[in-house]
Amino acid sequence: MSAFCLGLAGRASAPAEPDSACCMELPAGAGDAVRSPATAAALVSFPGGPGELELALEEELALLAAGERSSEPGEHPQAEPESPVEGHGPPLPPPPTQDPELLSVIRQKEKDLVLAARLGKALLERNQDMSRQYEQMHKELTDKLEHLEQEKHELRRRFENREGEWEGRVSELETDVKQLQDELERQQLHLREADREKTRAVQELSEQNQRLLDQLSRASEVERQLSMQVHALKEDFREKNSSTNQHIIRLESLQAEIKMLSDRKRELEHRLSATLEENDLLQGTVEELQDRVLILERQGHDKDLQLHQSQLELQEVRLSYRQLQGKVEELTEERSLQSSAATSTSLLSEIEQSMEAEELEQEREQLRLQLWEAYCQVRYLCSHLRGNDSADSAVSTDSSMDESSETSSAKDVPAGSLRTALNDLKRLIQSIVDGVEPTVTLLSVEMTALKEERDRLRVTSEDKEPKEQLQKAIRDRDEAIAKKNAVELELAKCKMDMMSLNSQLLDAIQQKLNLSQQLEAWQDDMHRVIDRQLMDTHLKEQSRPAAAAFPRGHGVGRGQEPSTADGKRLFSFFRKI
């Protein structure tokens, strides 16, 4: 019994190895090394769960001590019969009475040996339980790794699908840009044709003016010839004063000519008054054209203000994009620093990462709101160009409803709706250009009226003072032509301003679309980075209890070996996995 107890005590003091612990025996002097139950409990305390194991062992020791105390009165008669030596010889004399202190010491040592054996058995069972737990945790770890691999494959497949969708959208946008370029070329061709017509009309007017000057010179030459003929007739009348009949005939002819000239004079005066009235009407039309020019200038100023506002919004979006790009660079630098660090992520760093993720989510929502505001601005421009107040109120109500749902997804403003709004804006601008074309026709009508006025002034050139009237008519015509040219110039400027505003608005919308695409790509990158960080922290959290459960009691009987090497090997094993 004592030898078996010594063997169990030796197993308790050896390392916790199930294969080699059963065949180890203590030498003869090993019984002196075991002193008391408290010393044995201190030697075999296990770091994995020292409190629970010590409490259980103390309870078992208390039960064993109570049982031994109850069995002590019957042990003295059993010990005494074992003292005689077995054999066939004569009975020996009784041995001398043993010392009771020595017996109590021996019994105490036997009790300690029994307790040590039971402690060794309990430690062996504990070691087996820990090995089973280790196998179960290893199995759970492999299952989780397989699940993470499946999720990784699913995320890769989604990324490929999204990449195909974005390529399709890019191709659609390229076709839209090509169509817009074709339309711009057509508009430029129309403008060139209008310029050619204008130059042709100016050339025709200059040619007509030259012909009018030639006709005036011929009329003056005819007038000179007529005056010379009158002088010749007067001389003839003086020469033939003697002949009364000829004188009477000549007198009658002269009276007829005077009457004809007086009638012609009255007709010219009537035409002059009509010309003055038409000049007044032309001045009224010029004033109306000036009013229209002022209206067009005000509209161009409004368009400039809208363009300036859109440029400011574009600058704000660019500034926010630069800020987000800087934050992404900061996150990548922090990620590189975290990957180069050898220590594991603490709870404080995880909290900071979660707070940074929340801040990034808030910034992403802000950028979505900015994209929605740009979309509302495009719709507001469309409604303003239509001049429909009800549409403006509808846009304001839609914007208020969408601002109430700020946590909506990025698909609240799809690329299709922006494209339709852009097409609406293009149609409105085209309709405005078409509305300006009647003014061009009106100017052409006024040009024909000026031509008619020139024809009427040609008739008035035969009056008594043809040079003054001709100069006045030429001055009026030049003023009318200058006003017409100024109006045409203002109209061309308005057209150019509208075209530049349209192109700048298209560029701003295209830049906002590019920013939204970059935002979605950045969101995907951030999701991947956060998933990778969560996976690393999860693996590290799983490696910590495994490292704590790894047996570190190998150096109790062989020497004090550092336990950090085992922990490092275990961390390297999980990193390889």
From Swiss-Prot:
One of its GO terms (biological process) is Golgi to secretory granule transport. The keyword Translocase does not apply. Residues 63-100, 389-415 are annotated as: Disordered. Residues 69-79 have a biased composition (Basic and acidic residues). Residues 390-399 have a biased composition (Low complexity). It is found in: Cytoplasm, Cytoskeleton; Cytoplasm, Cytoskeleton, Microtubule organizing center, Centrosome. Keywords: Coiled coil, Cytoplasm, Cytoskeleton, Neurogenesis, Transport. Its main location: cytoplasm. Part of a tripartite complex with dynein and dynactin, acts an adapter linking the dynein motor complex and dynactin. Interacts with KIF1C. Interacts with RAB6A and RAB6B; interaction is specific to Rab6. Belongs to the BICDR family. This is BICD family-like cargo adapter 1. The gene is Bicdl1.
